[in-house]
């Protein structure tokens, strides 16, 4: 699907019956979550809540809420410029070629490589003046997050939570900007807590800034309601040589239009010119905090694990200015026990990951992140095994290949005769091909998701690999079982008879 911006995208979705509008008042406090959860579980449409209820003084918010946008894999594919899930493998192949290009083996391959390189070059983002995202500007006391219909998703949540904010940062020693999606707890009229984990790009940029420029505010811009390609580019494993804005242009089929921020100290940051709302501001110094910058206690919030997370300290982002389009749309979501939007995104991005993994490990024939595994905590790998110990090599390869798999706790490796997308087959392989002592790999003291309260130490825990492949000589001294399979000729004969098998012959 080709589109210009978020508004064009949702307009096309509406024409396809993939988006519906809700005209009656609905509160962003819990009610939107319940409605969206039911819609997502039923494979339902994206929605626009036209009358968010509960604004200050009991009014209706003037800003509608867009939700459940990526609630189906089909809409994720549309957002990535594809027409179907199958097309996402092609995006993975492009990323694979960009990540590790191979020398061409002839003129034809050289031509393809040149065409790909030119396509990427042609999608370099462009700066524009008079952008739509700055049609309206709030400054001074007008900067008040209570004027936006920010969701409170679950009964035990500490506060309203910005969920789809595209956070733009830049380290002092880097040429390119970093785009990341980090949740932000509202703690005041113009302040939120920026929850980014230590290894994420935004946190790394902030740490470098604090070391290089101690005591100086750290500039940040947050784009709300960016176009889907830019949002999805921020959560895709884009090669370090390619900017997320450039990749978004490649997905969308048109260069990403960028705008400079209005705040002078944010001059090095660029935001999507078509974004619905932009927050401009800084993390301010605080000499009384050990880090030298303002921090606050974040959480608890219901998360994609299906649990409330524990509280922890994160930087405070103070907003100096809010710019927006005329009649803006607020894009929101919730996270909870799978399935939720992160789980759906995980299933779709899974198809992008497969060609990337196959480039490094050609023996991998399929790869699956089951949504029940909270997007990335469990991976199932199907492979063509070639030697003893091969499955264990693949396990460690997956854990170390992409940053996205650093937090994968469980990897199950099976042979090429097992469908990793069918739990019945995976369980059959585990129960018939695994000896727990021989075929289980445990690795201690590895990076673990901060939200994984099952780990003994926050951010540090163990991983498990299960080798559910047939065992080769050297892995067992016993005669290995042979899988039962019907004769191919008999299967073909029954296939031809099947439709008429229960018909009575004429005259009987």
Curated annotation (Swiss-Prot):
It is found in: Cell membrane. GO terms for molecular function: 3-octaprenyl-4-hydroxybenzoate carboxy-lyase activity; metal ion binding. Its cofactor is prenylated FMN; Mn(2+). Pathway: Cofactor biosynthesis; ubiquinone biosynthesis. Disulfide bonds: none annotated. Prenylated FMN binds at residues 181-183, 195-197, 200-201. Its EC number is 4.1.1.98. Keywords: Cell membrane, Decarboxylase, Flavoprotein, FMN, Lyase, Manganese, Membrane, Metal-binding, Ubiquinone biosynthesis. Belongs to the UbiD family. This is 3-octaprenyl-4-hydroxybenzoate carboxy-lyase.
